[in-house]
Amino acid sequence: YAIGMTISAFMLYASLECTGNYSSLLHVVSVCVDKANAILELDTMDIDGKEIQPENYDIRLSDVTFSYDKRKIIDGVSLSIPEKTTTAIVGPSGGGKSTLCNLIARFWDVDSGEVTLGGVNVKEYSMNSLMNNFAFVFQSVYLFADTIENNIKFGRQDASHEEVVEAAKKACCHEFISKLPNGYNTVIGEGGATLSGGEKQRISIARAIMKDAPIIILDEATANVDPENEKELVEAVDALTKEKTIIMIAHRLKTVRHADQIVVVEKGQIVQ
């Protein structure tokens, strides 16, 4: 009888322990479902535009406003970015620099005003035809858990190995890739975990070179690079931006001193 009671007690304890574990799991699932529902309830963008080849790559923002969570982020901004020029956007953190770039590339839609590319409102482009005109190099680089070659070819899937190598040379990353045990076939970890910050950034630039888009958006691309890698990274950026329309977000004066125009953004407005 005592043995039976002991076994029953252990079985009851195990059941209660499982119930407690499942209770925690259900809470996590509930939170995830709530977050998913919040995303699904957001208004969706109309991305069914026309296949448009712009006549030029002039960019114009006309009296643009944008709010997020009922807070005005961009307030009545007008700006002209002529084709094949470099525009540097500077200002304090949270001032609206990255938001302006996101609106230009139509990651978000403006609340009022308009953004045009080649004289055509970006809303009239299909998403694919609009994105064909842009390449991006962000401060936070995301690389896939795949070979280095496939990460570079993400900019153009049909590229040959020779074209990948050429892009890597221009981005100053061919040398360190060649020293890896499997070269361009080396598989890197999720997010490029096995590479340094400078190495990841140069692979990101090689990817953008491979795409060969006419407009390049550089979002603080050299902000977190150590001094040893900065020279090579600057050379890589120079190779990427030749004969392109450049929009550059930066904190340091020396990275923008060669810009054709410098725009100071503060509290969602152009102040200089």
Segments predicted by a language model, with ranges:
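ABC-type nucleotide-binding domain
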Residues: 54-272
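Membrane-water interface of transmembrane alpha-helices in multipass transporters/channels
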Residues: 1-7
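Flexible, glycine-biased helix-capping/connector loops in cytosolic signal-transduction modules
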Residues: 14, 42-45, 182
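Conserved catalytic core of two-component sensor histidine kinases
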Residues: 6, 13, 131
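Cytosolic ends of transmembrane helices, especially the final helix of ABC transmembrane type-1 domains
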Residues: 11-39
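Pre-NBD coupling/linker segments of ABC/ABC-like ATPases
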Residues: 44-54
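Short gly/ser/thr-rich secondary-structure transition/capping motifs
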Residues: 42-46, 117-120
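Conserved E/DxxT/N motif and adjacent residues on the DHp alpha2 helix
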Residues: 38-41, 45, 153
